[in-house]
Design a protein with these regions (language model features):
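Amphipathic, Lys/Arg-enriched alpha-helical "gate/interface" segment within cytosolic domains
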Residues: 2-122
């Protein structure tokens, strides 16, 4: 078991999260590993904090965020990311956040509790 991943649960709904306080998702493959680990533990829900992603995730020119969104769609997973997002300067990424929050696969929230609530509702 990768030591940075752990299971959480709210209202009987399990999710994968990360116990470290630093970037652990440096490339789309790292995110795929986390999704696979969740699948091994019978959940398609993932809770991360802003700092769990490398800065390149927040730069749309890298394609990193797009690949993560595509993996969520392909594998039917849900992702909640909690953080202040104060270091995100890209207006395009902020637009992506607003649009993503209208859907059901990814949610950007300001608090971890809001992320858990969204992730574990239906």
């Amino acid at each position: 078991m990768p030591t940075e991943f752990m299971m959480g649960s709210c209202n009987g709904a399990p999710y994968v999260t990360c116990m470290r306080n630093e970037a652990v998702i440096h490339a789309p493959g790292d995110f795929l590993d986390m999704m696979a680990w969740g699948g091994e533990h019978d959940t398609n829900r993932i809770l991360l904090r802003e700092e769990h992603f490398a800065p390149s995730f927040y730069d749309l020119k890298t394609g990193f965020a797009g690949e993560v969104l595509q993996k969520l769609s392909n594998y039917g997973c849900r992702l909640a990311i909690a953080g202040s997002f104060s270091t995100v300067r890209s207006e395009r990424f902020r637009e992506l956040m607003r649009e993503a929050n209208k859907g059901r696969q990814i949610r950007f929230t300001h608090t971890e509790q809001d992320a858990v609530d969204w992730l574990t509702s239906s």
